[in-house]
Amino acid sequence: MLCGMLLFFSYGLRFQAQENGAPRTYDVRGTVINSTTHEPIARALVTIAGQESSSSQLTDNEGRFEFPNVRAGGCTLQARRPGFFGSNFSRDLSLPVEVGPDIHEHTLALTPAGTITGQITLPASDPGGNIRVQLMRRNLQEGLALWQPVAMKMTNSEGAFRFGGLQPGEYKLTTDSTIDPDVPSARVSVRWGFPPASYPEEGDSNASGALKINPGQQVNVQMALTRTPFYPVTISIAGKVTPGFSAQIFDGMSRAYAATLFLRAQQQGLYAWLPAGNYTAIIQSFSPNMPPGYASEPLTVRDAPVHADGPVILPVHPISVSIRKEFTSPVNNSGAQIVRIENGRQVIEPPADVNLVLISATDGNNTGGNLRHEPGGDDSSWQLENVLPGKYWVQPYANQGYVASITAGGTDLARDPLVIGPGGASAPIDIVLRNDTATLSVRLKTTGSASEAGEDQPHGYLYLLPQFDSSFVMQRVMISAQISYLPNIPPGTYHAFALDREMDLEYRNPKALEAYTGKGQIITMEPNGTTNLQIDVVPAEAEQ
């Protein structure tokens, strides 16, 4: 009788606590697994972050975790482990969950990292030690596929090297040139060494030949270097050499060779040792309160010493930029100002309405478009400074409204690269801004079964690709069965599709987008209007 009264009393207290608004709690359980092998991952760090607090623990030998007494409501589970990647190959995997009476166990899948090991072999008995090896990865940046450096290692005493912690993708390896360390006399016309080598071997650094690494894959490569004669190359430089002088020599695959500056009585120039082949010498100078200087010189080495009369280093002049606003509604002018120092005095001016990012079409390096008011010009007159000659993709970012068009002469920079000649020669850049933006109301199509409490909500990643020449592309925006409103979209016709995982698209390459032809929907966004979209999730194709 007493036991029954105590049980009734205990139940009554819990019922009374729930009636009085005390929080309900539930256990959150799950497993962390390898996304490739589906095996459990032990000692993965799992964190649960709720509305007011967070807690962490390591998984057991079966990859399991359990957080007791978690308050009902929304929270996020995060998992990480050295040697693995999470969402979009970041360090953590994040999963939003809803804690409630119907909560189920969760599975967190981490992607294993790949590894490249290799061996450098040289002729005869040389072990190939202390050779610099550069790892390049094919990255996507602003819709462009670019080969960019990832890491550098030196071979050990046996000529071996290792690159670990690699995310899936395409890679290449290159070695630096090396020359025998003996010091030649002034009249020596040849030295021996090893020119750069690449793996896989190819003639074009942007060709398709690459080393593909899948999740968790371990690859071993062998690279053989060939002993080759190097010949002295001298390039005379006209004009005064400034303290901020630099020079490099590149072969046809954009691999750099060392070059040194020499200063003699009435002569100055570059000195280098190169094997037979075709090259380009790039010379740059930087001085305070002066525009940068630039020059390039093509070289051909044919099994003999070379002496070239180098080019004159020309100052890089600014490019005129016109920004015209065709706004149909008032804008909020915050009155922000930029303060800079010019010739020892303070200059105050409003910020530009557009930020420009220039991406080299040859090596993928970024340069910020330093816009400043054109002296004596009106509010629409600007200058793009300190951009060296070359070919660049231009990505504009409007601070208000959107970029309706961006051109340079007859070149549409939303479609084609900007070409800057010697001395910064380029047609003026014309930018038109508008603010009659559209809004997209979007949600996923669902069967309705996934909306029950405790179940993970379906989600996808929305991509909007303009079917007209535009610098605007929306990608990797998470959407769910709940309506999301996406404002500030330039009006026009778009190809809309939602993928089951987030990935960057090579959207400037029509061939890379062929896999998504016929998937998703074609929608039209009207100026100042709202477009409603219900869309299905489609599988993401393998990385291009």
Feature names for model-found ranges:
Residues 1-544:
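Long luminal/extracellular ectodomains of secretory-pathway precursor proteins
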